[in-house]
Design a protein with these regions (language model features):
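Bacterial N-terminal signal peptides
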Residues: 8-16
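Acidic, glycine/proline-rich Ca2+-coordinating loop motifs
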Residues: 1, 20-123
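Bacterial N-terminal signal peptides that target proteins for export
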Residues: 1-8
């Protein structure tokens, strides 16, 4: 019985070792510039004596992002929330090209601190 357990462990270790292969080291993602995509959002944080980690510990929690189809064209649109910058809504035009429709959709928000986002498609 002891030999069977040892044999099982050796067999499992051999299979795990043989199945590891680094020869197919291919990139799964490609970095695209904002000039190519039209998505240019930065959640810029500016700390000072009034707003910093010690006075507001949630400062580094970040904003939020939602992805959904807002105009029923079967393309995923992107909504970013900002902490110290206005929110941004990007309409997907296809082929990873987006238009900033924040102003025309009145989705920039106000001076509040936005930290999350959700999106739902009812229809």
């Amino acid at each position: 019985m002891k030999n069977l357990n040892l044999l099982s462990i050796l067999l499992f270790a051999s299979i795990a070792f043989v199945s590891c292969d680094n020869s197919a080291n291919q990139n799964q993602f490609t970095l695209l510039s904002s000039n190519d995509t039209g998505v240019d959002f930065t959640n810029q944080l500016n700390e000072d004596n009034e707003i910093n980690y010690f006075t507001y510990p949630y400062i580094y929690m970040g904003g939020g992002v939602s992805v959904g189809d807002i105009n029923n064209d079967d393309l995923d649109d992107i909504f970013f929330t900002g902490n110290m910058t206005k929110n941004r809504l990007y309409l997907n035009k296809g082929n990873l090209k987006f238009d900033d429709i924040t102003d025309s959709s009145d989705s920039g928000g106000d001076d509040r601190w936005y930290t999350g986002s959700t999106m739902i498609d009812i229809n």
